């Protein structure tokens, strides 16, 4: 379930032929709406001022020697979007995917601490391009962490880092339907440390979940519950101090 490539390599774009790759919106973001760095404002004549900007007046710097318009303002067409932050956080302003979440968010609990176990409501279910982010700190001498994407009493996706299973550290993923657990998928790469902070990100894709921890891709888990709109809650439990839990669209 895991591979050895870095998150930086995986962020080369949404057209990445590697099916494990994270979308290009993470880390290598294009400029925001209207950005087009280095391009002229859309219109018939390159260098033309944006509509409504003092008709008849030349844009700054268009004619050498002409009085400068709007001192200190950048020339039209060179408004780059905000710089992308470090790691896997998308910037606001990314268009939302079609589905129940028309805006980008983030939505969820404000910065904590939050009481564990904690339930994050997912009204409308989950949809492709939905990104869930959990921040916290592993407690000293921790035994387990669990994330449960729930559909009623069923668990569509169980993500369960275990710190000491027969003296081994392992991550177990599974699905529970009609009170019966399915086949376990086990992951030996274990990025969690007792007493250390962590960031878990879960990205919903059309046919699987992707999980990254501390900005590095960890695993993916194919959907066993196909009706994603019925997954209405994320349960967070285990030996952690929970700081925040939220979701957004990318």
From Swiss-Prot:
Superkingdom classification of source: Eukaryota
Region 8 X 9 AA tandem repeats of Y-P-G-X(3)-P-G-A, annotated ranges: 36-109
List of residues binding a beta-D-galactoside: 181-187
GO molecular function: carbohydrate binding; chemoattractant activity; disaccharide binding; IgE binding; laminin binding; molecular condensate scaffold activity; protein phosphatase binding; protein phosphatase inhibitor activity
Primary location group: cytoplasm
Region entry Disordered, spans: 1-60
Comp. bias regions, Pro residues: 48-60
Pfam family name, one: Gal-bind_lectin
PROSITE patterns (alphabetical): GALECTIN
Subcellular location: Cytoplasm; Nucleus; Secreted
Swiss-Prot/TrEMBL GO biological process terms: eosinophil chemotaxis; epithelial cell differentiation; innate immune response; macrophage chemotaxis; monocyte chemotaxis; mononuclear cell migration; mRNA processing; negative regulation of endocytosis
GO cellular component: cell surface; collagen-containing extracellular matrix; cytoplasm; cytosol; extracellular exosome; extracellular region; extracellular space; ficolin-1-rich granule membrane
Expression (tissue specificity): A major expression is found in the colonic epithelium. It is also abundant in the activated macrophages. Expressed in fetal membranes.
Keywords: Acetylation, Cytoplasm, Differentiation, Disulfide bond, IgE-binding protein, Immunity, Innate immunity, Lectin, mRNA processing, mRNA splicing, Nucleus, Phosphoprotein, Repeat, Secreted, Spliceosome
UniProt modified residues of type Phosphoserine: 6, 12, 188
Annotated motif Nuclear export signal, positions: 226-241
PTM annotation (N-acetylalanine): residues: 2
Low complexity biased stretches: 38-47
Stretches forming Sequence repeats: 36-44, 45-53, 54-62, 63-69, 70-78, 79-88, 89-100, 101-109
InterPro entries to which the protein is assigned, alphabetical: ConA-like_dom_sf (IPR013320), Galectin-like (IPR044156), Galectin_CRD (IPR001079)
Function in brief: Galactose-specific lectin which binds IgE. May mediate with the alpha-3, beta-1 integrin the stimulation by CSPG4 of endothelial cells migration. Together with DMBT1, required for terminal differentiation of columnar epithelial cells during early embryogenesis. In the nucleus: acts as a pre-mRNA splicing factor. Involved in acute inflammatory responses including neutrophil activation and adhesion, chemoattraction of monocytes macrophages, opsonization of apoptotic neutrophils, and activation of mast cells.
Subunit architecture: Probably forms homo- or heterodimers. Interacts with DMBT1. Interacts with CD6 and ALCAM. Forms a complex with the ITGA3, ITGB1 and CSPG4. Interacts with LGALS3BP, LYPD3, ZFTRAF1 and UACA. Interacts with TRIM16; this interaction mediates autophagy of damage endomembranes. Interacts with cargo receptor TMED10; the interaction mediates the translocation from the cytoplasm into the ERGIC (endoplasmic reticulum-Golgi intermediate compartment) and thereby secretion.
Name by which UniProt lists this protein: Galectin-3
Encoding gene (name): LGALS3
């Amino acid at each position: 379930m895991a591979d050895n490539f870095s998150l930086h390599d995986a962020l080369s774009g949404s057209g990445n032929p590697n099916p494990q790759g994270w979308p290009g919106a993470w880390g290598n973001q294009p400029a925001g709406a209207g950005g087009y760095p280095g391009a002229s404002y859309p219109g018939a004549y390159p260098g033309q001022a944006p509509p409504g900007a003092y008709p008849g007046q030349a844009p700054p710097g268009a004619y050498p020697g002409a009085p400068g318009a709007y001192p200190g303002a950048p020339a039209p067409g060179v408004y780059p979007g905000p710089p992308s932050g470090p790691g896997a956080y998308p910037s606001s302003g990314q268009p939302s995917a079609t589905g129940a979440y028309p805006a980008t968010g983030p939505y969820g609990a404000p910065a904590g601490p939050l009481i564990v176990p904690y339930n994050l409501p997912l009204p409308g279910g989950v949809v492709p391009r939905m990104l869930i982010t959990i921040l916290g700190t592993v407690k000293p001498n921790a035994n387990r962490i669990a994330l449960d994407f729930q559909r009623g009493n069923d668990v569509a996706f169980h993500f369960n880092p275990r710190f000491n299973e027969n003296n081994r550290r392992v991550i177990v993923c599974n699905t529970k339907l009609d009170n019966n657990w399915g086949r376990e998928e086990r992951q030996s790469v274990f990025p969690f440390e007792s007493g250390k902070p962590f960031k878990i990100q879960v990205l919903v894709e059309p046919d699987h979940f992707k999980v990254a921890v501390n900005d590095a891709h960890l695993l993916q888990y194919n959907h066993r519950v196909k009706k994603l709109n019925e997954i209405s809650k994320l349960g967070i439990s285990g030996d952690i101090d929970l700081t925040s839990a939220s979701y957004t669209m990318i």
